[in-house]
Amino acid sequence: MISKECSVIVANHRGRPPTRDELLKAVRDKDAILCTLSDMIDAKVMDAAGSNLKVISSYSTGTDHIDIKEATKRGIYVTFTGDILTEATADLAFALILATSRQITQGHELVTSKRWKYGWDPHLLLGSDVHGTTLGIVGLGRIGSAVARRAKGFDMDIIYHNLHSRNIQMEEQFGAKHVDMSQLVEESDFLSLHCSLNSESYHLISESNLRRMKNDSYIINTARGQLINEAHLIKALKQRWIAGAGLDVFEKEPPSPNSSLLKMKNVVLLPHIGSATFLTRTKMAEVAAKNLLNVLNRKTAIYLVNPEVNPR
C-alpha cells in the first residue's frame, strides 16, 4: 500500500527489530516513519530524520515508545492503530487466566514428555476454579471491558480500579464495581492489568500490593511489562504470596536468560503476542499505512495521538 505512493526503506529484519544505528540510518531525511513498539522514537531519531519528517505512524495501540511531547513540539503527527487489537488481546488475557489456574502448560508438558504413566489420578494437576471467582481489572477501558465481558460468561464477579474516570457503562451493564487499589488487590482471585504505561502507572504492582493479594490468587499482564516491578513479582512467586502469574509482557523484552521467571513452574510466559492473529495484525498494518498516507496527503489520520499539533 505505502510502496505504491512512496519510496520505502525497510529497516527491520524478520525476527528482530533494527538496532539503534540501523534505525538512525534508515530514517535519515525521511518524510514519514512507520515504527513498531520495539522502536524507541525519541528526539535523536527525529533529528536524524530531519526537517522533512511529518508523521510517525506506530504499528501498535500503545505509543509509550514515542516521545509524543517532542514530536508535537516539532509539528510531527503521531498516529496509532486504535482499538483493532482489543478482542484478540482480551482473548489472550482470558487464555492466561485459564492456563495459569488449570495448569494447562504443565499438563501438556507431562503428556509430551511421556511422564504420564497411570491414566486418571484424583490428585493429578489440581488447579483452581475460574467460574464464580472474583476478577479484578486495573484499567476498565476497551481491552479491560472486553475481558470483563468474557468473565461474565464464567459467572465471575468483576471489580475494577481506574486511575482516573469510572466506567459507568460497564458498571450498569455487567455490575462491575469500582474500588480503590487496596481493595482490588485484596479481593481479586485474578488480577488482570489493562491500563496504559505512564509515570503514574509505572511499577503500579510492587511489593506492597503483592503482599496484600490472596495467596491463592493469580496476576495476569497483557498490557506493559513495566506496570509490574518484576523483581518484586519474582519474590512474590518464590515465597508464595500469590499462586502464579500469566505474563505476555516483561520489563525487558525478551527477559534475561538468567531471569528466575524462566525456571518457575507457577508461571505461564508468552512472547508479547496479545494481538498476534492473522486478521488483527493485517488490520493493524492497514490502519498504520492509511494513517501515514493520510497525513502525507494532507488528510485526517484515522487514529491520531496529537491532534493539537501545528503541522510543518
Question: Where is each model-derived feature located?
Answer:
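An N-terminal-biased, well-structured beta-alpha scaffold segment characteristic
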Residues: 1-79, 206
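Conserved beta-strand positions in the Rossmann-like core of class I SAM-dependent methyltransferases
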Residues: 9, 159, 226
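Rossmann-like adenosine-cofactor binding region
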Residues: 41-45, 163-260
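Phosphate-coordination loops involved in phosphoryl transfer and adenosine-cofactor binding
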Residues: 53, 131-134, 207, 216
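C-terminal helix-to-coil terminal segments
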Residues: 72, 79-91, 106-107, 119-126, ...
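Phosphate-binding beta-alpha-beta segment of Rossmann-like dinucleotide-binding domains, i.e.
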Residues: 82-134, 146-149, 163, 168
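Glycine-rich Rossmann-fold phosphate-binding loop(s) that bind the pyrophosphate
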Residues: 140-141
